[in-house]
Amino acid sequence: MRLLSALVGATLLAVLVPGAAWAEPPQALPANYTAADGKWQPAFDYDTDGCYPTPAISPSGAVATGLKNSGALNGQCRDQSDLDNTNSYSRSKCNNNWCAYLYDLYFEKDQAVAGWDCCGHRHDIEHVIVWVSGDQAQYVSTSAHGKYSTYLRSQVAWEGTHPKIVYHKDGLSTHCFRLAGASEQPENHYGTWQYPDLVSWDRFPAGVRDILVSANFGSASLAIKDGAFAYNLAQAKPSGIPFDPNA
């Protein structure tokens, strides 16, 4: 009886105490992007053992609080409604007849183990870079655990000009991006490749970008922000191309 009373009390506490409730993701920013950023935007899917991306910031400047890395791997972060309220953020640089288009996606948590997780963290931000020369994508780079893998265009599955990229759990480790298989079908609720509402670096609402790039996402970090952008381009740059990340 005491156990039952304790369980009932805990349930009531979770319902009645606002701090115990799951925070809803911020409202997405309206899509606002350059034609080039949109042309090369990745076509995304998200494996079932992880979260959907959500906005990192709202139009009013409210920053995502994320989720504790506990419970199910996709717990509280894989609702169909998340696909209808999400953003991707982009920034580009061109020189020496090459352009790099970098895309950031934010996820509320990154969890390696179901239940109590020792190795993941609140917040995850992953990145894709599309390398373009001669108005054709020549390489694609995907982020994983702070590093990049870079692939020839012939190794990449495409939907038009959009590389197909999947957010997945990397074995026993946490989540990252990978290339989609040539015949891979999307696993998200809609069963189609997803294009989160895109916001280019110079198209954020007034003041919102400054709040976003100053936000603390723990071990996760935006690659589009000053101080990180050139570093990420340098880490992922295909060998032998004349592109200068610091120009």
Region spans (language model):
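Short edge-strand/loop segments of extracellular domains
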Residues: 133-135
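Secretory targeting and sorting signals
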Residues: 1-23
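Residue(s) in the substrate-gating loop at a strand-loop-helix junction
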Residues: 130
